[in-house]
Curated annotation (Swiss-Prot):
Coiled-coil features, chain-numbered ranges: none
Misc. comment: Encoded by the cryptic lambdoid prophage DLP12.
Gene name per UniProt: nohD
Xref: Pfam families: Phage_Nu1
Family indicated by similarity: To phage lambda DNA packaging protein NU1.
Name this protein carries in UniProt: DNA-packaging protein NU1 homolog
Superkingdom of origin organism: Bacteria
Length: 181
């Protein structure tokens, strides 16, 4: 049902100023407004908006109350009591769920996955490196074998580094954690 500002104020038992404030807060307008044009509202859309807004306000109040209770109760908990252990378990479950959600949304990945991916890429790089000496020898037949052998030795070193990547990652991860923590 289309209603004007006055009718909407009567529906909610609020003042016209309150309706204007709600409009500034994002209450949906059907049409109108501007100089001399009456603003019209869809009462169903406004009621839906009001209910959602009211629920958000109430949820925020409850969140704050729960947070205050948690902070107060954390300081009151005594290690070894069942309440303390229950609180620790709840916190651990919440942390685990947050980590699972982060993993499901690909915000974090497991170290084993990183090791797998990097090892796979390193293997592909190693196979490309392996073909370089032969390609250079074909492209530049005037090169002496000692030059090609020198190139092979350095490429073998790089291939060995790439092949050992899966063994290096856990150590590098520990080093990273130490430096960033």
């Amino acid at each position: 049902m289309e209603v004007n500002k006055k009718q909407l104020a009567d529906i909610f038992g609020a003042s016209i100023r309150t309706i204007q404030n709600w409009q500034e807060q994002g209450m949906p307008v059907l049409r109108g407004g501007g100089k001399g044009n009456e603003v019209l509202y869809d009462s169903a859309a406004v009621i839906k908006w009001y209910a959602e807004r009211d629920a958000e306000i109430e949820n925020e109040k409850l969140r704050r109350e729960v947070e205050e209770l948690l902070q107060a109760s954390e300081t009151d908990l005594q290690p070894g009591t069942i309440e303390y252990e229950r609180h620790r378990l709840t916190r651990a479950q919440a942390d685990a769920q947050e980590l699972k959600n982060a993993r499901d949304s690909a915000e974090v990945v497991e170290t084993a996955f990183c090791t797998f991916v990097l090892s796979r890429i390193a293997g592909e790089i190693a196979s490309i490196l392996d073909g370089i000496p032969l390609s250079v020898q074909r492209r530049f037949p005037e090169l002496e074998n000692r030059h090609v052998d020198f190139l092979k030795r350095d490429i073998i070193k790089a291939m060995n580094k790439a092949a050992a990547l899966d063994e290096l990652i856990p150590g590098l991860l520990s080093e990273y954690i130490e430096q960033s923590g």
